[in-house]
UniProtKB/Swiss-Prot annotation:
Pfam families: COX2_TM (PF02790)
Gene that encodes the chain: mt-co2
Bilayer topology: Multi-pass membrane protein
Listed Gene3D superfamilies: 1.10.287.90
Record-given protein name: Cytochrome c oxidase subunit 2
Mitochondrial matrix topology ranges: 46-72
GO cellular component terms attached to this protein's record: mitochondrial inner membrane; respiratory chain complex IV
Keywords: Copper, Electron transport, Membrane, Mitochondrion, Mitochondrion inner membrane, Respiratory chain, Translocase, Transmembrane, Transmembrane helix, Transport
Source species, domain of life: Eukaryota
Family: Belongs to the cytochrome c oxidase subunit 2 family.
Predominant place of localization: mitochondrion
PROSITE patterns to which the protein is assigned, alphabetical: COX2_TM
Length: 72
């Protein structure tokens, strides 16, 4: 039964819907892991002190291009 403040799908009424729920959960976990990896790489690249300052000219726009779709 669905509730007004529910964040996920309602209970499955058929075996196909149960499989769809499992697929959704699996896909969401993969998307979460990829987003976490990208965030870690961005933070590591921005916060490191071992890089050349002149090589980072276009890195800010690349961070925006990567982070903006994840936020949206």
């Amino acid at each position: 039964m669905a509730h007004p403040s529910q964040l996920g799908f309602q209970d499955a009424a058929s075996p196909v819907m149960e499989e769809l729920l499992h697929f959704h959960d699996h896909a969401l976990m993969i998307v979460f892991l990829i987003s976490t990896l990208v965030l870690y790489i961005i933070v590591a690249m921005v916060s490191t002190k071992l890089t050349n300052k002149y090589x980072l000219d276009s890195q800010e726009i690349e961070v925006i291009w990567t982070x903006l779709p994840a936020v949206i």
